[in-house]
Amino acid sequence: MPSMNPIPSRNALTLALMLMASAAQAQSPSATEKPHPWQAAAPRLTAEAYFTNLKDGDRIETPYLLKFGLSGGWGLAPIAQPGRTKSGHHHLLINRDLPLNFKQALPFNDQYIHFGKGQMETVLTLAPGTYTLRMLLADQQHLPHFVYSKPATITVTKKNATDPRTLSVPGVSLQLEGPVVKNPFRVQFHASALNVAHLAQRLPDTGHFRLTVTPASGAPAVMAFVEGQTEVWLAPPAGNYTLQLELLDNVKTGQPLAPAATASVRVE
């Protein structure tokens, strides 16, 4: 893809309105699911779509597997069927600022990349150069939500001959702040080469996450994220825990779409 020049930044008034709307919309956890007592509210009031493995100033080589996250209790909903409130699908903006008109559908071109199947990642194949990237969530009609990322300006130093298709392998993973954490702490979910959706959409080839938190002694806590959520904040009692993340089929109820991912953590 050729190098492109970013357009001028949005005006301050529009940004202020976006932030206020995002804060009003963000809730944690989902209002339609009774949360487990160990679930906690996110420290930040605003919801955002974000990069989980890329930050402003990074220098990368392509092809590069870029991964997405979504906070504030929002969930992924493919465009095949309407999702509930606080749902949408990801968009990657390349050298484009946020739109000033959030009542106009996002265009389809090489600067607005749509992920309408509920994807959580893409492979960048950009040529060497400097780019500004950002994430933006939009609804079934591709109308933007006030859920987006800060811009990340990156430099592609080299484009390799690697086949991009080899970088994305079906599977799930979870990400923690570290092996030792303090409450509340975030658990981020990820699905590679698999699609995430609301259970109620009943779409083939999609799933929803289920997290099982097992203490060193006592009963495990099982949390189902049936509205497409891809992260959770937890505040369990101090101790040692094993976390297991699954992506369950939304049609063949209870059937995993990939082997579970596990991690151990100590809460102090």
Residue ranges of model-derived segments:
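Short, compositionally biased P/S/T/A/G/V-rich stretches that sit at domain boundaries
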Residues: 29-61, 156-182
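N-terminal intrinsically disordered, low-complexity tails enriched in polar/charged
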Residues: 7-9, 29-35, 268
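Long, low-complexity serine/threonine/glycine- and acidic-rich segments characteristic of extracellular
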Residues: 36-42, 65-71, 75-160, 184-192, ...
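Bacterial N-terminal signal peptides that target proteins for export
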Residues: 2-13
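Bacterial N-terminal signal peptides
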Residues: 12-22
